[in-house]
């Protein structure tokens, strides 16, 4: 049955062709079924309604183009974002039919663009113009429909359509069965592209979807069962495939989980998610299998995503993905979030459950997260999540992030950025501080060879790192270690033995320090003195005492600017660096408080605060509100501004060190300031 033989014409109006095509569909169905052919050429039409036993076949080169004439889309029973209502007829619609098909190499064009349907979403990006666009979602239709559903307003009283701004789907089959959509290309949908609702036995095969419009989901089976989606290409403005089962009250009343769904051999490009469960998922979802797919786009946000909240409720279980190759995605390879749309106006307390989710043999070259799970705060309802034999490279922010209440989240041979991700219970240490400390000790068995050294080295790097190790030891000693081995305390004692090795190797009995030259007046070489001082307080020795006196003497005699601030080094004459403040002053303050009489200690602390304040005045840049890393009082260095002497550069490292210098100097000051006769205003000035 070729439509041109039954009244349809390429030069006819959309209304005329709509009438001819719908009349032919009814005739063929009444005769027991058959194939209706859309021949090569462009055929404008309004909404058409499929009937049982009818195949709509688009020949190669045929374009079935739906006109932007809202009056050609009469009210029908449908659902909009998971809520039952009467709304504009989808472009191709069916209700309570069976054995229908859309096939062929032709194109179905929904006519969506910024001058037609898309502007109705109320976003200027899609053509909406305040005061010009007459029909749009900003008129409150979406919120009104949501409230009707929340309040239990009967379905037949929820009438929208003309003047309400709720855009129609491209293809929407309702309460139908045995459906085939094969080989066609679908473009420019007003809203969701393919939306089977409360249907079963559906095959979508070889379909190409190109739709960059708002809410342009590719294929959204809702409350459907026995669905096969294969060999398809999705380039969408929203989720490529989003499995749904009704929103809130309506989904619970339908009580029809989407289930038994296979997705295979598909390619996903742009879109919010590759394979998505939710968020209109109140009826639940089970038995989803996605495999052998390719996904790649800087705009594709997630690969497998489950999104829901405690307005929805529902049980989501048995969701499996395997053998998927990903070039890049924008956010996460696997994301489960139970706080989707946290400000949604709805009745809450319907806690959803997500369980038995697996991802296996999935690779990804770039993403912000590998696995991102956001559980609920009240109920432990995300559990039995298994990621196995996956390899994610180029992960920028965090390999795995799991928050909220979860249980049995397992990583089995998950490699992220070249490193094996361990389950929390499988980690040798439950805290990163202990784990990192022992990892470093294993990597560099001799503490004096840290910083990739080939021979014993005196360096600020060693001092900074070993102070962190010392803090770890002090925090976890006395049976507090999280080591899972047989002897946790002995394992912790290994830290302090490692730290003892450094002063023993680097300082001889006369207090001479290997690699240190007093005459260099190098502040970098003083930083490690703070570590030595802390170790000396725990394990006093004559050699350390002598070395500390030498290092303090250096600071007493350190060359200074005319304003009294330390030069960074003798070879960096007249230069003040933020680095140097951190390298020298914390030891300067700590040593003074611990070893000098109160009046002398006060003088040292006042001097330290004065240097910090003057450094602030000389390095702060009003334009950027950051501190330049250095200042040259002669204004002659190649890096110095000739007018004010400030460096051209701001170093993130130096900013951090400058703040830590102030913090550590404050820590050195006793709580009872009267003990060293320091005034509170001096301390407040530093704060």
Segments (PLM) and residue ranges:
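Well-ordered alpha-helical scaffold segments within catalytic/enzyme domains
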Residues: 463-488, 527-541, 584-600, 657-674
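Extended ligand-binding groove/face enriched in aromatic
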Residues: 490-500, 505-648
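Short, intrinsically disordered, charge-balanced linker/junction segments flanking boundaries
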Residues: 177, 423, 670-679
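Aromatic-acidic/polar surface patches that form glycan- and anion
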Residues: 17, 429, 458-462, 521, ...
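Extracellular/periplasmic carbohydrate-active domains that bind, remodel
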Residues: 1-424
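Single conserved hydrophobic/aromatic residue that forms the stacking wall/gate
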Residues: 677-687
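Surface-exposed beta-loop-beta
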Residues: 231, 246-257, 626-651, 666-673
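Low-complexity, Ser/Thr/Pro/Gly-enriched N-terminal "stalk/linker" regions
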Residues: 425-511, 542-558, 562-563, 622
């Amino acid at each position: 049955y070729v439509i041109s033989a039954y009244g349809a014409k390429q030069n006819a109006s959309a209304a005329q062709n709509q009438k001819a095509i719908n009349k032919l569909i009814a005739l063929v169905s009444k005769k027991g079924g058959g194939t209706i052919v859309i021949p090569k050429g462009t055929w404008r039409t309004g909404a058409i309604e499929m009937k049982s036993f009818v195949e709509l076949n688009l020949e190669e080169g045929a374009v079935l183009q739906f006109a932007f004439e809202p009056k050609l889309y009469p009210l029908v029973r449908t659902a909009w974002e998971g809520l039952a209502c009467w709304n504009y007829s989808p472009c191709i619609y069916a209700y309570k039919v069976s054995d229908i098909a859309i096939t062929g190499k032709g194109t179905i064009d929904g006519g969506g663009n910024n001058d037609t349907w898309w502007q109705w979403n109320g976003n200027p990006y899609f053509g909406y113009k305040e005061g010009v666009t007459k029909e749009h979602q900003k008129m409150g239709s979406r919120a009104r429909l949501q409230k009707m559903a929340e309040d239990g307003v009967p379905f037949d009283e929820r009438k929208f359509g003309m003047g309400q701004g709720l855009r129609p789907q491209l293809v929407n089959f309702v309460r139908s069965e045995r459906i085939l959509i094969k080989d066609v290309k679908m473009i420019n949908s007003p809203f969701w592209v393919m939306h089977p609702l409360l249907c079963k036995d559906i095959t979508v095969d070889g379909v190409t979807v190109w739709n960059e419009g708002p809410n342009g989901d590719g294929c959204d089976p809702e409350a459907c069962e026995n669905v096969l989606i294969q060999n398809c290409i999705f380039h969408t403005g929203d989720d490529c495939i989003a499995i749904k089962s009704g929103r809130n009250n309506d989904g619970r009343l339908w009580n029809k989980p989407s289930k038994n769904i296979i997705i295979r051999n598909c390619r996903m490009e742009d879109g919010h998610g590759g394979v998505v469960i939710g968020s209109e998922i109140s009826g639940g979802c089970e038995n989803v299998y996605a495999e052998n797919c390719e996904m790649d786009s800087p705009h594709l946000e997630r690969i497998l995503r489950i999104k829901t909240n405690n307005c929805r409720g529902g049980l989501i279980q048995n969701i499996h993905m395997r053998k998927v190759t990903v070039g890049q995605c924008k956010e996460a390879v696997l994301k489960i979030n139970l706080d989707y749309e946290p400000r949604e106006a709805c009745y809450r307390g319907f806690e959803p459950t997500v369980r038995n989710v697996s991802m296996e043999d999935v690779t990804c070259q770039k993403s912000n997260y590998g696995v991102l799970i956001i559980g609920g705060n009240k109920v432990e309802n995300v559990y039995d999540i298994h990621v196995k034999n996956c390899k994610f490279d180029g992960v920028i922010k965090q390999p795995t992030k799991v928050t909220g209440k979860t249980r049995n989240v397992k990583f089995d041979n998950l490699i992220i950025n070249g490193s094996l991700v361990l389950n929390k219970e499988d980690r040798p240490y439950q805290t990163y501080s202990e784990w990192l400390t022992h990892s470093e000790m294993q990597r560099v068995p001799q503490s004096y060879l840290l910083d990739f050294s080939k021979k014993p080295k005196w360096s600020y790097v060693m001092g900074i790192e070993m102070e962190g190790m010392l803090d770890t030891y002090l925090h976890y000693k006395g049976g507090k270690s999280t080591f899972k081995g047989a002897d946790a305390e002995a394992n912790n004692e290994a830290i302090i033995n490692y730290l003892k090795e450094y002063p023993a190797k680097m300082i001889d009995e006369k207090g001479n320090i290997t690699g240190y030259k007093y005459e260099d007046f190098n502040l970098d070489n003083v930083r490690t003195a703070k570590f030595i001082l802390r170790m000396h307080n725990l394990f006093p020795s004559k050699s350390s005492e002598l070395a500390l006196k030498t290092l303090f003497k250096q600071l007493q005699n350190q060359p200074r600017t005319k304003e009294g601030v330390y030069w960074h080094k003798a070879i960096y004459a007249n230069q003040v660096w933020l680095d140097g403040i951190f390298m020298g002053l914390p030891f300067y303050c700590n040593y003074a408080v611990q070893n000098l009489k109160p009046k002398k200690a006060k003088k040292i602390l006042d001097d330290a605060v004065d240097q910090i304040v003057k450094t602030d005045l000389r390095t702060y840049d009003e334009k950027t509100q950051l501190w330049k890393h250095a200042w040259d009082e002669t204004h002659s260095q190649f890096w110095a501004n000739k007018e004010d002497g400030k460096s051209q550069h701001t170093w993130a490292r130096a900013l951090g060190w400058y703040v830590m210098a102030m913090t550590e100097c404050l820590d050195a000051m006793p709580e009872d300031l009267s003990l060293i006769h320091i005034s509170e205003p001096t301390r407040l000035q530093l704060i």
